[in-house]
Structure formats: C-alpha cells, structure tokens
C-alpha cells in the first residue's frame, strides 16, 4: 500500500467524510489544510440529479461570480470593425480575425477565454479541432458567441465561470482562491448554485442539487450542508 504523505494523514485526521459541514466551517477547514507553497484554488463539485446519458438533461452555461475567481483572465476576441474597437475598450487582450486564426494555428494561444461575434464564426469554425479539445471553442450557450463582444469580455474579466456536467452528472468548476474570505467563497458558491438551479432541465426529476463538495487544489473534498447556504433564486 502506498505510504500516505504527511499532508494526506492530516487531511484524514481532520476531515470527516461522512459529515456535511456548515459552509463557514467547511471553508475554515479547507484554509487550515491549504498548506501548498502557492495560493490554492477553491474548487467545487456539484452532483446533479440528472441522467447525463440523455441530451435533454445535460446542464451547460456560465455565470459571473460576485467576487471573481482570483485569476487574471486573458481574453481573445474574433471580430472586426466597430466591434473590434469595443472589445479593446472593454479590456480584450487580443483582437483579430484571420491574423488571430493564424496565431492559433501556430500554437500561440496565450489566452484563457475566446469570444467571437457571429460574423467571425466562419473563421473560428476552422479552428474547432484546436480550440475544442482545450475547452476554448466559443459557444452561444455560454455567451461567448455574441454580437455584444464588449459585454462578453467584461464578464470574462469579472470572473465568469463556465460549467458543464460530466458523464456522471457532476459539475466541476473553480469558485475562488484559498486566501478569499469565508464570506466571499460562500457568496460565490451561492451564485453558482442559483445559476445551476435556474438551468435545471424540465425533464430532471427529484432532488436536483444532490451533493455539494468544495476542495482546494491539493486537498480533499469537504461536503457542504446546503441548509447553510442561501440559494433562493
């Protein structure tokens, strides 16, 4: 049997895997155990009451977290004309059309989010095999294909997170950093859960938010008692 690291031993001693923790208690526990030499991200896993095999029950979307994610997001925008100027004014890091596509083809992708105006999709569509596997392909469902590219840029910069359930019906995303206050993490988590509830497929039956767990980059998951959260839409 593999030898447990000191950190894993401490986590096993401190975290009761059978318990759902009140949110402030859960955050305090995560912060106590976040001992890496870098500021760890706070991630969330939400088990949804859906049948992920059915396309009409898949959940996908985006929402802006009130306190952002703690990351500096670089945004590339495929657009032209007046939209290009608007994107730059909104804070886009890279703006272009065919020239930007050539950069992508060369592997020059120094950005975290790609936004495109509808008229630019003829260019972006050729990049699907490059952008798709990296989760960068613009999509109208998450607001990254839009005539209002300036708003999309501002949302991305403000800490918008995109979510999509995996094959097991679980949503994984980031809701902040371990150096956020408990209140900031709580409010970010609540904002995400409200967005998920609004995105509940009409065909999904029973309890929708089945389990909510938060963790840090190098830590174990801590289950959160949903009664300690305000998720009224």
From Swiss-Prot:
InterPro entries: Ribosom_uL1_bac-type, Ribosomal_uL1, Ribosomal_uL1-like, Ribosomal_uL1/biogenesis, Ribosomal_uL1_3-a/b-sand, Ribosomal_uL1_CS. Pfam families: Ribosomal_L1. GO terms for molecular function: rRNA binding; structural constituent of ribosome; tRNA binding. GO terms for cellular component: cytosolic large ribosomal subunit. It comes from the Bacteria. The keyword Repressor applies. GO terms for biological process: regulation of translation; translation. Keywords: Repressor, Ribonucleoprotein, Ribosomal protein, RNA-binding, rRNA-binding, Translation regulation, tRNA-binding. Binds directly to 23S rRNA. The L1 stalk is quite mobile in the ribosome, and is involved in E site tRNA release. Protein L1 is also a translational repressor protein, it controls the translation of the L11 operon by binding to its mRNA. Belongs to the universal ribosomal protein uL1 family. Part of the 50S ribosomal subunit. This is Large ribosomal subunit protein uL1. It comes from Vibrio parahaemolyticus serotype O3:K6 (strain RIMD 2210633).
């Amino acid at each position: 049997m593999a030898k447990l690291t000191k950190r894993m031993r401490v986590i096993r001693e401190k975290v009761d895997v059978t318990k759902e923790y009140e949110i402030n208690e859960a955050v305090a526990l995560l912060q106590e155990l976040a001992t890496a030499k870098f500021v760890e991200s706070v991630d969330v896993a939400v088990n949804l009451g859906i049948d992920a095999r059915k396309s009409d029950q898949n959940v996908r979307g985006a929402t802006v977290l009130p306190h952002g994610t703690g990351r500096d997001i670089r945004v590339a925008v495929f657009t032209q004309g007046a939209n290009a100027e608007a994107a730059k004014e909104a804070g886009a890091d890279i703006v272009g059309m065919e020239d930007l596509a050539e950069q992508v083809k060369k592997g020059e992708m120094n950005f975290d989010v790609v936004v495109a105006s509808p008229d630019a999709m003829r260019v972006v569509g050729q990049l699907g095999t490059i952008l798709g596997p990296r989760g960068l392909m613009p999509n109208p469902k998450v607001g990254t294909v839009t005539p209002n590219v300036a708003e999309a840029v501002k949302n991305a910069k403000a800490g918008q997170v995109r979510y999509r359930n995996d094959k097991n019906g679980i949503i994984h995303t980031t809701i902040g950093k371990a150096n956020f206050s408990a209140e900031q993490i709580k409010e970010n988590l609540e904002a995400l859960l409200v967005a998920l509830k609004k995105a509940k497929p009409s065909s999904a039956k029973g309890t929708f938010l089945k389990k909510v767990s938060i963790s840090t980059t190098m830590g174990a998951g801590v289950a959160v008692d949903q009664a300690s959260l305000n998720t009224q839409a």
